[in-house]
Each structure stands twice: as C-alpha cells, then as structure tokens.
C-alpha cells in the first residue's frame, strides 16, 4: 500500500523554533519527527512512501534520499507553487494504490496501521479518519459520528459548534480510496479537510476510527514543548 506524507507546508506557526528547516525536520530527541514517522511505518511493513514537499523541500530530500538507508523506498512530488495540503494528490493520482495512507508530516505516533487499514476495508469506506480526543478541540476538526461510526458532521474550526460536543477530532492520519479524487474541486489551492473530506460527511462513505493509541500533533510551539 502506498503511503503519502504531506510535508509541503511552510509551518509558519513554528518559525520561532526553526526558520531554516521545514517543520517535519524539527528534532525530537535528536532525530527529525518525519524520520520517526517513517521508522514506525517501516516496522509495520509500509515501505512504499511518497512525500509531497515544497518550502525548503530540498532539506527533506537531501536527508532521506531514496529511503534505502531507512529501510523504505521514497519518491517525491515537489510543489513548484503552493497547491494547498491536498492539491498534490491530484498530481500524483496515477502513482497511488486504490487505497492509500495519507499522513501529516508533523506528528509523533505509535499506532497499529495494519489494524487501521483493515478497519477501513471492512467498512468499504472512501475515507477513514483516525480520531481521538486532544487538548485543543477548539483548534481542530471535530467529528460527529453515528452509532456505526459513520461520520455525520464535520465541524471545522470556523464552524459554529453546539454548547456540548464529544471531544473527537481528526488526528491527521487517514486511509483513503482513490475515488475521493474523482470529486470536482475548484481553485488553485485545495484544502483536504474542507474540500475533500467534509463533503463526505453524512453520505455513509466516511468513517472514524476511534483509538486511544499515541498520536501527538507538533503543529505549534506549545504542543512541541508539551
């Protein structure tokens, strides 16, 4: 199964920590967070990796190369201009397997990806989201699901929310089917959450995978140091 890791963002919120390297290369105990992601994937047999890069992407490409010394095979898609966090998917569609993993590049995790993928296949889903509670639901996409774990509503950060809601957020780890790229999306920059995933809410094609497994987002200095 192909793994796509999104590493093309500028990481503007992390400039106070590292302005000369991309966010996925920020070290955790001496090793880049992206290296730790790749190590976790490799240990579970996910070795076919495509990394989308943009801002300071040469730093990532120079460090990981073809992935051989990390036990994986890595190819790259370099965004010459910003495409949004999902725009590159349409450019590499022909390189994807029918189902593929799509991961943010700035998270620490220790999860069973094979079980996650099997859950997706069992539900014959177009999209499956790894969901969990976190410390900042106000700054995250909140997911509301039915009793079968099908996603009914996706509440983005800017959406009005009920007074009380379950702290269930999208962790930035997904199993997707290529069918999701058959949608017609307008605009030069494509937002994964708002333009590809959110429209699937309520259709019975997107499920959430609630799990207590370890996932830590490194998206801000506060979360990095926590």
For each predicted feature, which ranges?
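Conserved beta-loop-beta/alpha segment of the NTase-like Rossmann-fold superfamily
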Residues: 61-62, 66-147, 183
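A structural signal for short hydrophobic beta-strand segments in well-ordered beta-sheet cores
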Residues: 25, 143-145, 197, 208
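Catalytic-core segments of class I nucleotidyltransferases/pyrophosphorylases
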Residues: 46, 100-101, 108, 114-121, ...
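Alpha-helical elements of Rossmann-like donor-binding domains used by nucleotide-donor carbohydrate transfer enzymes
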Residues: 36, 40, 59, 91, ...
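N-terminal glycine-rich phosphate-binding loop and ensuing alpha1 helix
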Residues: 1-61
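Residues at the starts of beta-strands that form the adenosine-phosphate
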Residues: 2, 47-49, 73, 126, ...
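Structural beta-sheet core signal
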Residues: 5, 51, 102, 127-130, ...
């Amino acid at each position: 199964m192909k793994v796509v890791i999104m590493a093309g963002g500028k990481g503007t919120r992390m400039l106070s920590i590292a302005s000369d390297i991309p966010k996925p290369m920020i070290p955790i105990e001496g090793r880049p967070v992206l290296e730790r992601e790749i190590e976790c994937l490799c240990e579970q047999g996910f070795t076919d990796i495509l990394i989308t890069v943009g801002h300071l992407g040469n730093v990532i490409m120079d460090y990981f190369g073809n992935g051989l010394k990390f036990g994986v095979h890595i190819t790259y898609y370099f965004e010459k201009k910003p495409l949004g966090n999902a725009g590159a998917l349409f450019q590499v569609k022909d390189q994807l397997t029918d189902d593929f993993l799509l991961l943010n590049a700035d998270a620490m995790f220790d999860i069973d990806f094979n079980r996650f993928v099997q859950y997706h296949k069992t539900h014959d889903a177009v999209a499956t989201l790894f969901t969990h509670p976190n410390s900042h639901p106000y700054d995250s996409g909140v997911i509301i699901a039915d009793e079968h774990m099908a996603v009914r509503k996706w509440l983005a950060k800017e959406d009005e929310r009920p007074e009380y809601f379950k702290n269930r957020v999208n962790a930035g780890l997904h199993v997707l089917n290529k069918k999701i790229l058959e949608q017609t999306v307008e605009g030069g920059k494509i937002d994964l959450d708002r333009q590809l995933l959110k429209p699937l809410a309520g259709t019975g094609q997107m499920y959430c995978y609630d799990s207590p497994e370890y996932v830590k987002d490194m998206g801000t200095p506060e979360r990095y140091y926590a």
